[in-house]
């Protein structure tokens, strides 16, 4: 056993996260990878993929020096990509050849050489753009199509948030000459019965510059709200007085009927600009025309997005500090009763109790006042006040993403505190100082995980019948890689084991919380249920994370216990309020 422990500790010491530096190259040179080792970028990863899983996949290829899954600095959630570094350069091409597009947790990964220098990544030499791709074409099939022209550094089909192809992609060749050969051969070719367009990739900055140039010198005009009885001659006569027209088209459907819009192209920009200025919103044959610069579809979508975002921000600013969130409402409270409860504190612009699809109250609602001062007064007076036998919770309404960010920051702060304790204990042990490492307890949602619930509770599997959570029974955790690898020397024996338990508990808790929150959509409930489940032995928690059915069973039991706990709290609060009222009488 001691030999195994020593070997594991030795592996952990060797497996440290190191940043690989790229060699200096000139503009004329193709970026080269390091010859002393191999650094790979692994993308398209499922959010729960860990360093340990990647180690299991890549270690058979060669000796792994480090693995790092990149994570959000605040939420610690995976960003969907990682870096894998090998000691030997030969392992890099071998990993790309054998593992590229391998399924990892149901998603094909994308592997390419890591290029640390951003200027070389953004230079774009040898990078081509392909559009009008068939939805069935994925990264692998695109790579197979273009690999015949030369060595490919990266290949990617753009997808939406659901993983569905957006119809375009990019292929980055090592040599620019290979990219030009690919363009010449594939542009206009049929791929899955669709003709594709292939060209050198143009950077966003250059595209924006060209777009601004087109805007400044446009000659093509878009016209809509055209009367169905308008003839081609009338259409041309309307615009012809502003300058020479090179083309004028009234769009028609398959039956030859006008679709209500058309295009007019002038010979020069001045004529087009004058037509837009004078004819936009002009009434023609009883309809108000829209006349503007003709835009491509992506331009219109961008403008619509900007308008939507501006309207959203304006709405948020309008309700900032005046909209209240009220929860723990009794089922008997409707919109009118909610408004009556808050009417004494000021002018109410709206009051709404949220309901499900069957019309039943969801137990919370919103009250909007005319001024922030009125809203603040209502919070002071109504928060925790008993209404219809229930203590209300009243606070300023926040968007869901704001609440999540605040919770993530709180978790991050607790994590940093634990790390500080761990580092202090490690430093003391290295210096030979006496003392015992005692990590601070980790509570989710502000409740200790072993709070006993009063009354008969639904029993969770493997828990004692008194309703209290069992004591922690962490076994020795297995090797940890990347972000879990210890840095430097750590306390030995019991202190070392305690440190590993703390790190393991943190990692499991963060993964478990995400799954529980997805089920509850409630920060408080998710935190407390996570705390209850997390107190099970680590191996059992790992099984829950890997088995959704088993997790659902434990979640339902913990959720029932949590609901009972909440009901008991509310009953106690109501009894206390009634006793206080009797005392006053």
From Swiss-Prot:
GO molecular function list: molecular condensate scaffold activity; mRNA 3'-UTR binding; poly(A) binding; poly(U) RNA binding; promoter-specific chromatin binding; ribonuclease inhibitor activity
**Top-rank taxon, per record:** Eukaryota
SMART domains per the record?
PolyA, RRM, RRM_1
Lineage, highest ranks first: Eukaryota, Fungi, Dikarya, Ascomycota, Saccharomycotina
What PROSITE patterns would the database entry show? PABC, RRM
Q: Where is this region: Disordered?
A: 14-37
Q: What does this protein do?
A: Binds the poly(A) tail of mRNA. Appears to be an important mediator of the multiple roles of the poly(A) tail in mRNA biogenesis, stability and translation. In the nucleus, involved in both mRNA cleavage and polyadenylation. Is also required for efficient mRNA export to the cytoplasm. Acts in concert with a poly(A)-specific nuclease (PAN) to affect poly(A) tail shortening, which may occur concomitantly with either nucleocytoplasmic mRNA transport or translational initiation.
Q: What is the name attached to this protein's record? A: Polyadenylate-binding protein, cytoplasmic and nuclear
NCBIfam families registered for this protein in UniProt: PABP-1234
State the Gene3D superfamilies in the record.
3.30.70.330, c-terminal domain of poly(a) binding protein
- Family recorded in the similarity comment: Belongs to the polyadenylate-binding protein type-1 family.
> Which compartments does it reside in?
Cytoplasm; Nucleus
One cellular component GO annotation, for this chain's record?
A: cytosol
Residues forming the PABC domain are 488-567
Looking at the record, the residues that make up the RRM domain are 38-116, 126-203, 219-296, 322-399
The record's principal subcellular location, in a coarse class, is cytoplasm
Keywords in alphabetical order, please: Cytoplasm, mRNA processing, mRNA transport, Nucleus, Repeat, RNA-binding, Translation regulation, Transport
Query: Entry's InterPro entries?
Result: Nucleotide-bd_a/b_plait_sf, PABP-dom, PABP_1234, PABP_HYD_C, PABP_RRM1, RBD_domain_sf, RRM2_I_PABPs, RRM_dom
- GO biological process terms held by the UniProt record: mRNA 3'-end processing; mRNA transport; nuclear-transcribed mRNA poly(A) tail shortening; regulation of nuclear-transcribed mRNA poly(A) tail shortening; regulation of translational initiation
